[in-house]
Amino acid sequence: MTNSDWMPTASISQLKQRATLLRQIREFFAERNVLEVETPAMSHATVTDIHLHTFKTEFVGPGYAKGSALHLMTSPEFHMKRLLAAGSGCIYQLGKAFRNEENGRYHNPEFTMLEWYRIGFDHHALMDEMDALLQLVLRCGSAERMTYQEAFLNVLGVCPLEEEMRELKQVAATLGLSDIAEPEEDRDTLLQLLFSIGIEPKIGQITPAFVYDFPASQAALAKINPADPRVADRFEVYFKGIELANGFHELDNPAEQLARFKADNAKRLEMGLTEQPIDYHLIAALEAGLPECAGVALGIDRLIMLALGEDHIDKVTAFPFPRA
């Protein structure tokens, strides 16, 4: 530790600009009558996604001598959907999320997330609204849009929905990724590798890029597209090589959602990962009735970094992980 390690990594000027942008975001939703909510940062259940790693703690207060396991939330999604099912109407949240993963230029274990849900919207309507928010905060032009399939065909010349693993690995070889790709047996992991290395740096350079209709196997909590069951009603947003957001036309079928959670846990066990506790409160909320809606999660630290022309999230956050 040096004598200056107590100092914030962002300048006071940048922190003031950050506060201004957060105020603009809140005004954006207030003008649209979207309610701001707060949900727990800790939960008894957590995500089952094989790509997400959580922080775990334990409550040992009165009545819990043996301890009660808790997870810091990777997203407020599950709690917010319970509010939607309870009749909250359209809602948003600006708050902290936690992921026990990377720390670096675009990652901090504790970060600020904006998540919102719009009743009566599908993912295309939500993309329209997000486009308006991005133009406000980033002062950029309207976003370009492409399907996941179009992104692969236009940039890599390969169809992600139809090509065999052999062809996908050949594309990986042209990108210098043979050592990683050749032993890979999971199709989605290989597709994600090709997307992150081969496509992300080449889209959304002038204006943000919306990529939608991801493979059904990557649906997560999104509906399967009724017109093309090969794809899910899911989108992601990229700008200047950085992933900003992930959105869904939200799945409202409790049986299907529970089956996906269980399939995730089965895959976790196959991979030698810990099985995660399923959120049965969410399943009960879906059984009670989730209104037709779309939702999206947006990384605020990355958004503000881009808005202020910085190249590292440490320059727009006060105390990142090394100084926390």
UniProtKB/Swiss-Prot annotation:
Source species: Vibrio cholerae serotype O1 (strain ATCC 39315 / El Tor Inaba N16961)
Binding locations of ATP: R99, N100, E101, N108, E243, L244, G299
Subunit note: Homodimer.
Molecular function GO terms recorded: acid-ammonia (or amide) ligase activity; ATP binding; lysine-tRNA ligase activity; tRNA binding
InterPro entries registered for this protein in UniProt: Aa-tRNA-synt_II (IPR004364), aa-tRNA-synth_II (IPR006195), aa-tRNA-synth_II/BPL/LPL (IPR045864), EpmA (IPR004525), Lys-tRNA-synth_II_C (IPR018149)
UniProt superkingdom: Bacteria
Sorted UniProt keywords: ATP-binding, Ligase, Nucleotide-binding
Its job: With EpmB is involved in the beta-lysylation step of the post-translational modification of translation elongation factor P (EF-P). Catalyzes the ATP-dependent activation of (R)-beta-lysine produced by EpmB, forming a lysyl-adenylate, from which the beta-lysyl moiety is then transferred to the epsilon-amino group of a conserved specific lysine residue in EF-P.
Record-linked PANTHER family: ELONGATION FACTOR P--(R)-BETA-LYSINE LIGASE (PTHR42918:SF6), LYSYL-TRNA SYNTHETASE (PTHR42918)
GO cellular component: cytoplasm
GO BP terms: lysyl-tRNA aminoacylation
Root EC class: ligase
SUPFAM superfamilies associated with the record: Class II aaRS and biotin synthetases
Keyword DNA repair: no
Family: Belongs to the class-II aminoacyl-tRNA synthetase family. EpmA subfamily.
Descriptive protein name: Elongation factor P--(R)-beta-lysine ligase
Catalytic activity from the UniProt record: D-beta-lysine + L-lysyl-[protein] + ATP = N(6)-((3R)-3,6-diaminohexanoyl)-L-lysyl-[protein] + AMP + diphosphate + H(+)
Binding site for substrate: S75, P76, E77, Y117, E250
EC number annotated for this UniProt entry: 6.3.2.-
N-terminal signal peptide: none
